[in-house]
Protein backbone atom coordinates (compact mmCIF):
# COMPACT_ATOMS: atom_id res chain seq x y z
CA UNK A 1 0.00 0.00 0.00
CA UNK A 2 1.17 3.41 -0.72
CA UNK A 3 1.29 6.11 1.89
CA UNK A 4 -1.96 7.71 0.70
CA UNK A 5 -3.87 4.43 0.69
CA UNK A 6 -3.34 3.61 4.36
CA UNK A 7 -6.61 2.90 6.13
CA UNK A 8 -7.73 5.81 8.28
CA UNK A 9 -9.19 5.17 11.67
CA UNK A 10 -11.99 7.43 12.89
CA UNK A 11 -10.17 8.95 15.84
CA UNK A 12 -13.19 10.84 17.20
CA UNK A 13 -15.30 7.71 17.20
CA UNK A 14 -12.56 5.72 18.92
CA UNK A 15 -12.15 8.39 21.62
CA UNK A 16 -15.88 8.63 22.31
CA UNK A 17 -16.29 4.85 22.47
CA UNK A 18 -13.30 4.55 24.79
CA UNK A 19 -14.54 7.38 26.99
CA UNK A 20 -18.02 5.91 27.46
CA UNK A 21 -17.02 2.26 27.64
CA UNK A 22 -14.13 2.22 30.08
CA UNK A 23 -14.28 5.62 31.81
CA UNK A 24 -17.90 5.85 32.95
CA UNK A 25 -16.92 7.08 36.40
CA UNK A 26 -14.83 9.88 34.92
CA UNK A 27 -17.73 10.95 32.69
CA UNK A 28 -20.15 10.92 35.64
CA UNK A 29 -17.72 12.95 37.75
CA UNK A 30 -17.25 15.44 34.92
CA UNK A 31 -21.02 15.84 34.55
CA UNK A 32 -21.32 16.27 38.32
CA UNK A 33 -18.65 18.97 38.33
CA UNK A 34 -20.35 20.83 35.48
CA UNK A 35 -23.75 20.68 37.21
CA UNK A 36 -22.19 21.87 40.47
CA UNK A 37 -20.43 24.75 38.70
CA UNK A 38 -23.62 25.85 36.95
CA UNK A 39 -25.50 25.67 40.25
CA UNK A 40 -22.87 27.78 41.96
CA UNK A 41 -23.01 30.38 39.20
CA UNK A 42 -26.82 30.49 39.34
CA UNK A 43 -26.90 30.82 43.16
CA UNK A 44 -24.28 33.58 43.05
CA UNK A 45 -26.29 35.46 40.42
CA UNK A 46 -29.52 35.18 42.42
CA UNK A 47 -27.74 36.26 45.62
CA UNK A 48 -26.38 39.38 43.93
CA UNK A 49 -29.82 40.22 42.56
CA UNK A 50 -31.37 39.89 46.02
CA UNK A 51 -28.63 42.00 47.63
CA UNK A 52 -29.21 44.72 45.02
CA UNK A 53 -32.98 44.59 45.55
CA UNK A 54 -32.46 44.73 49.31
CA UNK A 55 -30.32 47.87 48.95
CA UNK A 56 -33.00 49.57 46.85
CA UNK A 57 -35.70 48.64 49.37
CA UNK A 58 -33.60 50.04 52.22
CA UNK A 59 -33.25 53.33 50.34
CA UNK A 60 -37.00 53.44 49.70
CA UNK A 61 -37.72 52.76 53.37
CA UNK A 62 -35.38 55.56 54.44
CA UNK A 63 -37.05 57.96 52.01
CA UNK A 64 -40.49 57.01 53.33
CA UNK A 65 -39.32 57.42 56.93
CA UNK A 66 -37.98 60.90 56.11
CA UNK A 67 -41.24 61.85 54.41
CA UNK A 68 -43.22 60.54 57.41
CA UNK A 69 -41.12 62.60 59.83
CA UNK A 70 -41.57 65.70 57.67
CA UNK A 71 -45.33 65.14 57.58
CA UNK A 72 -45.41 64.77 61.36
CA UNK A 73 -43.53 68.05 61.78
CA UNK A 74 -45.83 69.74 59.25
CA UNK A 75 -48.92 68.42 61.04
CA UNK A 76 -47.63 69.61 64.41
CA UNK A 77 -46.81 73.03 62.96
CA UNK A 78 -50.09 73.51 61.12
CA UNK A 79 -52.18 72.24 64.00
CA UNK A 80 -50.66 74.65 66.52
CA UNK A 81 -53.44 76.81 68.05
CA UNK A 82 -51.38 80.02 68.02
CA UNK A 83 -50.74 79.59 64.31
CA UNK A 84 -54.43 78.96 63.65
CA UNK A 85 -55.37 82.07 65.62
CA UNK A 86 -52.82 84.24 63.81
CA UNK A 87 -54.09 83.05 60.40
CA UNK A 88 -57.70 83.65 61.48
CA UNK A 89 -56.89 87.18 62.60
CA UNK A 90 -54.61 88.20 59.72
CA UNK A 91 -56.14 86.42 56.73
CA UNK A 92 -59.79 86.03 57.65
CA UNK A 93 -60.01 89.28 59.67
CA UNK A 94 -61.60 87.46 62.59
CA UNK A 95 -61.63 88.94 66.07
CA UNK A 96 -61.64 87.41 69.50
CA UNK A 97 -65.13 87.68 70.98
CA UNK A 98 -65.38 89.11 74.48
CA UNK A 99 -67.72 87.55 77.02
CA UNK A 100 -70.13 90.52 76.75
CA UNK A 101 -70.48 89.97 73.00
CA UNK A 102 -71.25 86.27 73.31
CA UNK A 103 -74.82 85.27 72.57
CA UNK A 104 -76.22 82.00 73.86
CA UNK A 105 -79.06 80.40 71.93
CA UNK A 106 -81.33 77.95 73.71
CA UNK A 107 -84.13 75.89 72.32
Swiss-Prot record:
Its main location: membrane. GO terms for cellular component: cell division site; plasma membrane. Residues 1-24 are cytoplasmic. Keywords: Cell cycle, Cell division, Cell inner membrane, Cell membrane, Membrane, Transmembrane, Transmembrane helix. GO terms for biological process: FtsZ-dependent cytokinesis. Residues 46-107 are periplasmic. InterPro entries: Cell_div_FtsL. It is a single-pass type II membrane protein. The chain crosses the membrane at residues 25-45. Pfam families: FtsL. It is found in: Cell inner membrane. Part of a complex composed of FtsB, FtsL and FtsQ. Belongs to the FtsL family. Essential cell division protein. May link together the upstream cell division proteins, which are predominantly cytoplasmic, with the downstream cell division proteins, which are predominantly periplasmic. NCBIfam families: ftsL_broad. This is Cell division protein FtsL.
Amino acid sequence: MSENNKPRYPLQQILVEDLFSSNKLVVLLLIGILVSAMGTIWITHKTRQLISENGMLILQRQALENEYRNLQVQEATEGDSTRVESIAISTLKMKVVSSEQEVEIRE
